[in-house]
Amino acid sequence: MEMKKRISLELRNRSPAEVAELVLDNCRSVDGEIEGLNDSYKELEFLSMANVELKSLSKLPKLPKLRKLELSDNSISGGLDVLTERCPNITYLNLSGNKIKDLSTVEALASLKNLKSLDLFNCEITNLEDYRENIFQRLSQITYLDGFDQEDNEAPDSEEDDDDDDYDDDEEPGPRRYEAEEDEEDEESASDLGEEEEEEEEVGLSYLMKEEIRDEEDDDDYVEDGAEGEEEEEEDEEDEAAAADQGEKRKRDPEDEGDEDED
């Protein structure tokens, strides 16, 4: 796919002034030149044109906010002074896998005062004697060369990690902001869960209290029923005793009458 067509696809119905990041890797440049980019991309901060058969940067537009530029695996051999004129705020530049041979070619980057990381890996220039010492000497502003500083300490995974806080509120948040939002959501979920558990405990206690009250009422009813039963049994025993006494009296009455007749 040609670079110009690829750019139109990457816009996704946005205007060039709304684009902060543009990845054009593996498309095809025409005659090794940049095409489809213009000064309208004034908000562009990240541009990647890796493996696009690029030979020249002469048609690179003015990109005042560009901070990271990926140009790896192309055929660029010079003309780096264009970067100092049109992209003065670059902090990261990847030229690995290009045809850069001489230190004089790289010296043009000395005017990029904000440049912190430069990658020339797999370029012929890396075969020069004292290559690293010479680059650090000529480009005193850089911290990392081919991923390592002068003390051979490896660079962080991304030079943009420290720049996440620079985004405006209306721009896309960085990964840290997403993580913060996720943490807040987790805390809210945990809080909601805690409240639900408290409510469940309150409901459970209320239920137990009601059950205890019901049990006490049932015990009282049982006691009252038992007392009534005992009273009824006592009344029945009294009735039986009275009936027995009456029967004995009836037996005695005929005997008494017989005694009177004999007299």
Curated annotation (Swiss-Prot):
Chain segments carrying region Disordered: 146-263
Placement of LRR repeats on the sequence: 43-64, 65-84, 89-110
PROSITE patterns: LRR
Swiss-Prot/TrEMBL keywords: Chaperone, Chromatin regulator, Cytoplasm, Leucine-rich repeat, Nucleus, Phosphoprotein, Repeat
UniProt biased composition (Acidic residues): 148-172, 180-203, 214-242
Region (ZID domain): 202-263
Subcellular locations according to the entry: Cytoplasm; Nucleus
Keyword Lyase: no
GO molecular-function terms, A-Z: histone binding; histone chaperone activity; phosphatase inhibitor activity
Sequence similarity: Belongs to the ANP32 family.
Protein name: Acidic leucine-rich nuclear phosphoprotein 32 family member E
